[in-house]
């Protein structure tokens, strides 16, 4: 029997060759493991880069869709603007006829028309008794009777469409 610590240890050439072969195999596997680890680390970094780029592209797409949704909503709200503008002279004529005759049927028809148009964003601009606002009102005359800077009479009603001025109110303003 032999032991490696004994002085009469004899090297067996077959055992030595097996040990050398196994050592070479272990070194080769260690080198392969290092190579595979390097490949895995590179792949992991590349995956992280691609993932980050994907997140940025996804955020860009979401922002683009939000912008397009807002633009579509604005277009939808204002799509009827020219049609509604064409109705304003008809409403003006009804208002003039109501002033001349106080016809209750005509008042109901005008109110019904305004109610329908309000569903599409049309709102009358308040004028009489209000402080003059050049963004909402157009002064077509002046009077000295009343409080300075206030609107005395509304000659033609103005309207907003979805909070944008469609037509300014034509008014008589008190100026002292």
Curated annotation (Swiss-Prot):
It is found in: Cytoplasm. GO terms for biological process: protein folding. Keywords: Chaperone, Cytoplasm, Stress response. PROSITE patterns: GRPE (PS01071). Pfam families: GrpE (PF01025). Gene3D superfamilies: 3.90.20.20, Head domain of nucleotide exchange factor GrpE. One of its GO terms (cellular component) is cytoplasm. Its main location: cytoplasm. The keyword Coiled coil does not apply. It comes from the Archaea. One of its GO terms (molecular function) is unfolded protein binding. Homodimer. HAMAP family: GrpE. Belongs to the GrpE family. Participates actively in the response to hyperosmotic and heat shock by preventing the aggregation of stress-denatured proteins, in association with DnaK and GrpE. It is the nucleotide exchange factor for DnaK and may function as a thermosensor. Unfolded proteins bind initially to DnaJ; upon interaction with the DnaJ-bound protein, DnaK hydrolyzes its bound ATP, resulting in the formation of a stable complex. GrpE releases ADP from DnaK; ATP binding to DnaK triggers the release of the substrate protein, thus completing the reaction cycle. This is Protein GrpE. It comes from Thermoplasma volcanium (strain ATCC 51530 / DSM 4299 / JCM 9571 / NBRC 15438 / GSS1). The gene is grpE.
